[in-house]
Amino acid sequence: MREHNVTRFIYSSSATVYGIPEKLPLVENMKTGQCTNPYGKTKYMVEEILKDLCSSDEAWSVISLRYFNPVGAHTSGLIGEDPNGIPNNLMPYIAQVSVGKREVLYVYGNDYDTPDGTGVRDYIHIMDLAIGHVKAMIYQKFKNPAGFKAINLGTGKGYSVLEVIHAFEKASGRKIPYKIVDRRPGDISVSYADASLANKELGWRATRNIDDMCIDAWNWQQNNPNGYKC
């Protein structure tokens, strides 16, 4: 990139770099690196490499967008999430249960320190996330800030697993059978963003709520019960 004079870089990072939160909401200047899973560790390591790059060469401008939990689908219903094998994330798993592709949703733990005992996350619609990327590109093009800058992309509101299930039932008109099982190693109880920096620097704010996310995810899934056609 440097050889071809390309020195502006937008990195798809993750809120998992924060690890177990010291306090909430999560703010960009909080300590990172106490990651609870390999995915978060890799995101953290790349951020550290990019920080070193910016420190070694002031020509570089790097924005690290820390995604919270991207879900949903394009509003057209033509583009959606089609994971290989068994989904690792909540929303596509719920969607596959809703169309009968899977029999039951496994809820990992109901003994967290949350109102209903299930884990709470900040879910963000992929369309809001895409707009966040465009805003970051515009910011870099016209302001071209040197150095490394981390920016959260989230709604600032957390929803529990059970709240997401109920929202999807409302969107689909179908009951979602679920079973409570043991916690998964590495899962934390609560995570949600302070997204004020994105609003201040990029002029960005998430506009879609959990109902919108579930409606669009269901629209995609019911039209593509077996995912993309090969």
Regions found by a protein language model. Name each.
Residues 90-230:
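C-terminal substrate-binding subdomain of Rossmann-fold SDR/epimerase-dehydratase oxidoreductases
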Residues 14:
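Residue(s) in the substrate-gating loop at a strand-loop-helix junction
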Residues 9-11, 63-66, 122, 152-154:
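Structural signature of the Rossmann-like NAD(P)-dependent dehydrogenase/reductase core
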Residues 18, 71, 157-159:
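Feature marks short, surface-exposed loop/turn motifs that line or immediately flank catalytic pockets
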Residues 3, 7-8, 17-69, 78-89:
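Catalytic helix-loop patch of NAD(P)-dependent Rossmann-fold dehydrogenases
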Residues 75-79, 118-119:
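Short acidic, glycine/proline-rich loop/turn micro-motifs
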Residues 20-22, 74, 162-164:
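Short glycine-/acidic-enriched loop or helix-start segments at secondary-structure transitions
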